[in-house]
Amino acid sequence: MARDRRDYYYRQAKEEGYRSRASFKLKQINERHHIINRGDSVVDLGAAPGGWLQVAKELSGGKVLGVDLQRIVPIEGVETIQGNINADSTIQKIIKTVGAKGADVVLCDAAPNLSGNWSYDHARSIELATSALECAKKILKPKGNFVVKVFQGDMFNDYMQKVRDNFVRTMAYSPKASRSQSAEIYVIGKKFLTAPLRKGDKFVVDIEKLGSSGDGAVLIEGFVVFVKEVEVGEKVRIKITDVKPNFAFADVAERLGKTEKPE
């Protein structure tokens, strides 16, 4: 506590009426990466005591919802749910509150109770962040944004890849308000993908037409995929190389011959 009293952001939080010094982390993340826009609906997972909820409400002015296993002391203009984000009943309550279209932004600044065993604490942090990601995938709007805190360690890169698989842009960021000795870092996903495919997926397709750029253009579950270096009439096995909100790119993994024409 003595260290906290000497901490600049701790003092600033007290002076400005925020519930925790973590409020300044979200402010700095948003200043740099523009996660929350005016009018956005925001869901904060693991929100107690509510420092991020206060900032989210200031930034968006829209619907803000906090979810936590603990009761969150009320904040004006903010709704709360006491529940487990892994439970279907909690997901249903979130959707009922923010609406069927989903939230514009999902945040999670939660951390596990520290044991002092770093490998264990890192694994618990990744587990918690994975739960937050799975929840976000169920409640985010298409092109929505996601921010989650994790502890750095040997499982970090695998977790980053999971986020990359679901967002157009992904980055890691450490705000100035994080303590210098802290191993925490924030993973940011921008523009949530709702496509029926992901990078690395493979499909067998018939090339029936070319797009304006000369690439093959095929539909997979109604989603446009552009395939490089193909000709009309080819049957190919493709591998998805990049996914955007409205289309994807693919390379040829195997040429399977010509498309069979009906007699």
From Swiss-Prot:
Gene3D superfamilies found in the cross-reference section: Nucleic acid-binding proteins, Vaccinia Virus protein VP39
Binding residues for S-adenosyl-L-methionine: G50, W52, D68, N84, D109
Active-site annotation: K149
SUPFAM superfamilies given in the database record: Nucleic acid-binding proteins, S-adenosyl-L-methionine-dependent methyltransferases
Catalytic activity: uridine(2552) in 23S rRNA + S-adenosyl-L-methionine = 2'-O-methyluridine(2552) in 23S rRNA + S-adenosyl-L-homocysteine + H(+)
Domain TRAM per the UniProt entry, residue ranges: 196-254
Domain of life the protein comes from: Archaea
Keyword Acetylation on entry: no
Matching InterPro entries: NA-bd_OB-fold (IPR012340), RNA_methyltr_RlmE (IPR050082), RNA_MeTrfase_FtsJ_dom (IPR002877), rRNA-MeTfrase_E (IPR015507), SAM-dependent_MTases_sf (IPR029063), TRAM_dom (IPR002792)
EC numbers for this chain: 2.1.1.166
Keyword check for Mitochondrion: no
One function term, GO molecular function aspect: rRNA (uridine-2'-O-)-methyltransferase activity
Keywords: Cytoplasm, Methyltransferase, rRNA processing, S-adenosyl-L-methionine, Transferase
GO CC, alphabetical: cytoplasm
Subcellular location: Cytoplasm
Pfam families given in the database record: FtsJ (PF01728), TRAM (PF01938)
Biological role stated in the UniProt entry: Specifically methylates the uridine in position 2552 of 23S rRNA at the 2'-O position of the ribose in the fully assembled 50S ribosomal subunit.
Family affiliation: Belongs to the class I-like SAM-binding methyltransferase superfamily. RNA methyltransferase RlmE family.
Protein name: Ribosomal RNA large subunit methyltransferase E
Organism the protein comes from: Methanosarcina barkeri (strain Fusaro / DSM 804)
